[in-house]
């Protein structure tokens, strides 16, 4: 029998610590082994209690979560989930750049009334974080800041033969890291990513993804050529599409939100269906809502294939579940095998449930 995931809860609010402990303790797969009020206590208890996962508040006395994080990373193999305020995306992604595995946004008001809703997401994020290899977390911490560069050796800027469109929302950043760590150059493909994020997070996500693979990662700009071995991440506030046939370009549009979000996956997937036809692959990862389901249907109808994250490995099985229910999932797979399924698809091995 697998032992429970050991969790250390860190927050300067006694009420929040109590509520989180109670909420997490309902799941027998998780054991809260301790709590801490300050960053200093968090460091000490991480060493003493050896938790698998630390939930770490950002704003705390003595040492903030940001200041305590590098000490926790250096002194343990614990995966760290940041508890972030909605008004500090730059600080949250600074924490991710320092090695935190994931984050959850605390509501500015009414945290007590929201705990039931948040606890289910937090439990799933804890389980997902636990699956992240400690050495990959360390690689993120040790890597120097990078400026993503799309310059390629001679011959590498030819248009791709296949397009891979990837959609993610809640739980998406670590899921994307897992997927791209299993992909690399030489597959004659370009990758187009829609990740639902608050404003200000996209550039940091691109920097993190660039550390997982030898692909080039860029924040997409209107009119960019679509080149093989490059991943284009949609910027906040604009829908991303790919247009053209022989020569493919990125198109960014300030059109109305779809499913309440912009960028949304459906416009991207539908454009990939039109531009790539049978050479298109759609991937729907963890996330709330139904974004990606309609676009996946378009890709399948155009002769392409879709790969959908399974319920067990998803933080929220909203987007993947909606895709399955519409009958647009060519294959359903756990997160850790999705990169393998993408490679198989790129090599022409078609997979169907």
Functional labels for PLM-detected ranges:
Residues 37:
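Glycine-rich phosphate/oxyanion-binding loops and their immediately adjacent helices
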């Amino acid at each position: 029998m697998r032992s429970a995931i050991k969790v250390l809860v860190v927050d300067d609010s006694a009420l929040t610590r109590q509520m989180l402990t109670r909420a997490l303790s309902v799941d027998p797969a998780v054991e809260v082994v301790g709590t801490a009020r300050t960053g200093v206590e968090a460091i000490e208890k991480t060493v003493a209690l050896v938790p698998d996962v630390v939930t770490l508040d950002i704003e705390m006395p003595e040492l903030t979560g940001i200041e305590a994080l590098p000490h926790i990373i250096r002194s343990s193999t614990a995966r760290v989930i940041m508890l972030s305020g909605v008004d500090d995306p730059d600080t949250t992604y600074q924490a991710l750049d320092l090695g935190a595995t994931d984050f959850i946004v605390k509501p500015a008001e009414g945290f007590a009334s929201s705990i039931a809703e948040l606890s289910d997401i937090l439990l799933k994020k804890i389980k997902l974080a636990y699956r992240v290899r400690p050495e990959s977390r360390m690689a993120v911490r040790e890597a120097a800041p990078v400026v993503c560069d799309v310059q390629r050796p001679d011959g590498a800027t030819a248009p791709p033969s296949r397009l891979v469109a990837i959609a993610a929302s809640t739980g998406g950043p670590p899921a994307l890291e897992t997927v791209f760590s299993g992909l690399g150059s030489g597959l004659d493909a370009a990758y187009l990513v829609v990740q639902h994020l608050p404003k200000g997070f996209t550039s940091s996500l691109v920097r993190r993804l660039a550390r997982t693979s030898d692909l080039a990662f860029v924040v997409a700009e209107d009119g960019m050529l679509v080149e093989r071995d490059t991943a284009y991440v949609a910027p906040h506030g604009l829908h991303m599409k790919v247009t053209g046939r022989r020569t493919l370009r990125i198109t960014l549009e300030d059109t109305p939100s779809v499913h309440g979000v912009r960028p949304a996956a459906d416009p991207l997937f539908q454009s990939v269906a039109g531009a790539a036809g049978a050479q298109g692959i759609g991937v729907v990862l963890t996330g709330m809502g139904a974004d990606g389901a309609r676009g996946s249907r378009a890709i399948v109808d155009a002769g392409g294939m879709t790969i959908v994250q399974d319920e067990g490995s998803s933080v929220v099985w909203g987007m993947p579940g909606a895709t399955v229910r519409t009958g647009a999932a060519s294959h359903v797979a756990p997160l850790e095998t999705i990169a393998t399924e993408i490679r198989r698809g790129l090599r022409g091995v078609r997979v169907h449930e």
